Amino acid sequence: QIMLDVAYQMFAQGKNKLELTALHLTVGSDVNPLHTDNFEEVSFGPILYGAKKLGIQIQTRYEVSNNAGVDICSIVNNEGYDFLLVGSGISMSNTPDDIAASHYRASFYNRYFKRFKAPESWFYPGALLKDKTKMFIEQSNCPVGVFVNRNFVKASNVIVVIDSEEDLFLLGYAQTLLKSTHGSASVLDKSSSTTPGNEVIKEGILRFTEDVKQTTLLREKDLTPQSFNGFNFMLISYKTWNDVSEHRKEALQKMPSTLILSK
């Protein structure tokens, strides 16, 4: 249901009619085929109900897979989808159930794996998200969005992080999003006078704030925990995410729900 809300808010007011397919994969080829109908009904019940409330059509698709990531990319590439939206899983979520699951997993790691010298990065949220994001982005032939749920309800106060000329594509997504939510957006420009394409970046942001209502340029130039005060959604590029997830880990503890986008 949350992923449906994200997709609707991000794309319902785009140039093209919104056509959605909800894909659910069960990992493990030993699933009894007689049980798949029941799995499908249970899996898609909430999202079909949500789509009906929003007044949109949605296709549902259930697959059994031995390698979910590879199969998702294969479906996207072979069947001509023009955007892939995936969830980041529980590792970066701050919902109570997900936090409990993460704590359990950390406890399980400490109790059972450390004695075998297993690499702790297996259970490190940043590494897990980075690996998943990298795979989808590198193997998909369309733009990819990886959604991190931090109690998402509505993207009404959006922060858009710009670090290079390549990040300006985010402003187009922000403009479409605001048409759906009628909210506001603020741009945090991390670029400096020595950043390649600095003038193009300034012009792009200026044009965005002049042309799109309820948009502003923030005075600050760096991400801190306080940067996210008052915001409930962040748009950030995959490249910039990789940088801030490495160098601004403390700030990201306070981040709102986030969509990490590839061009």
Which residue stretches match the model-derived regions?
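Non-transmembrane accessory domains of multi-pass membrane transporters/channels
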Residues: Q1-F44, K52-Q57, D167-F169, L178-T181
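Short, surface-exposed alpha-helical segments at coil->helix boundaries
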Residues: E41-G45, N198-K202
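Intrinsically disordered or low-complexity boundary/linker segments at protein termini
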Residues: Q1, G87-P196, K202-K263
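Short amphipathic alpha-helical segments
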Residues: L4-Y8, C73, K130
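Short beta-strand elements in bilobed, periplasmic/extracellular small-molecule ligand-binding domains
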Residues: L54-R61, A185-L188
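Charged docking surfaces used in two-component/phosphorelay signaling
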Residues: E63-G69
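Short, well-structured alpha-helical segments in soluble
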Residues: D71-E79, T224-Q226
